[in-house]
Amino acid sequence: MNDIFIIAGPTASGKSELAMLLAQKFNGVIINADSMQIYKEIPIITASPSISEKQQIDHYLYNYVSIFHSDINELNSFDNISQSKVNADYNNINLQQSITKHLTDRRYSVAKYVQEACKIIRSVIHALKLPIVVGGSGMYINALVYGIHHIPEITLEIRMQVQDLYKKLTKQEFYQKLIDLDPISKNYIHSSDAQRMIRAYEVVLQTNKSIFSYHNSKLVSPLEGYNVKKIILLPDRQLLYQNCNQRFAKLATNGELVDEIIKIKPYYDHISISAKKALGINEIISYLNQELTIEEAITIAQQKIRQYAKRQLTWFRNQTINGYTLHYQSMSELYKTQVNDVFFN
């Protein structure tokens, strides 16, 4: 057995459900390729697989990276804490002192994802099972399929130096300093993109080279030699928007989601920039701060999720793939015609 399935597509398109179906049919194992579902403290708001789903089928690379700059779980567990105890328990922690003391260079990267995913894929194939990679993060999927440019590791000292500088300056001031050091980055990075600005600044400070100078090297696919089958889900836009709205409304009216955000809210300033991009977090925090009603929070979050889904839909439509592209107007059409025709006939 040398096959690998990759199921990709926009959020709320039905990827996880299809992955479960195929895993049950073909003795498969599910491997995450969603940049938000890696985080362990926010499984509900990121719509990660449920405990029941994980019990039915083996899932890997879900909910295993901390959203915090350091591993706050060493200080106080996020599991099994009742809502009434949250504030009292967390107020007893000298968080600033602990975070400074335990700060690590555990920031996740695409390169780390590819390394972990390839290791799991090899193990799954060795066990004569089918690896099914599932997600909507195009950067993860492309890096896994086509390869990634290797950039030298950034030291913890440089990372802290850049983080401190970013906090002291406005975004525009930081952007100007980056352009002064790395003029090439002006052609590729916008001043509103904090994550990419910080990354580019770290690289030029560490290596004295632009991050984009490393992009000239030839890419080699980590999955070379395997039979990779890609399945891209492209639902009708109105169906996609409907799925986005329904899923977040269902999550937001679930008390467990609010509890999840209550637990991380006191430490918001210590959450990594990438984790703060998880859709819905900021709206639920605004609700908890009494800045929005729950209805307003849901409406604003739904709008942002639809906008994100639209961008994903456009991106996946423009991809040239060696595999299957499934177009459908309803979820029943996806399963009764498209999936049946491709996998079960």
From Swiss-Prot:
Residues that, per the record, bind substrate: T11, A12, S13, G14, K15, S16
Cofactors: Mg(2+)
Key word Phosphoprotein present: no
Protein's GO biological process: tRNA modification
Protein's recorded name: tRNA dimethylallyltransferase
InterPro entries linked to this entry: Dimethylallyltransferase, IPT, P-loop_NTPase
Record's subunit section: Monomer.
Listed Gene3D superfamilies: 1.10.20.140, P-loop containing nucleotide triphosphate hydrolases (3.40.50.300)
Region: Interaction with substrate tRNA, residue numbers: 34-37, 195-199
Function (record text): Catalyzes the transfer of a dimethylallyl group onto the adenine at position 37 in tRNAs that read codons beginning with uridine, leading to the formation of N6-(dimethylallyl)adenosine (i(6)A).
MF (Gene Ontology): ATP binding; tRNA dimethylallyltransferase activity
Annotated keywords: ATP-binding, Magnesium, Nucleotide-binding, Transferase, tRNA processing
Catalysis: reaction(s): adenosine(37) in tRNA + dimethylallyl diphosphate = N(6)-dimethylallyladenosine(37) in tRNA + diphosphate
Record-annotated site: Interaction with substrate tRNA: S137, R159
Family designation: Belongs to the IPP transferase family.
Record-listed E.C. numbers: 2.5.1.75
Residues bound to ATP: G9, P10, T11, A12, S13, G14, K15, S16
The protein's enzyme class: transferase
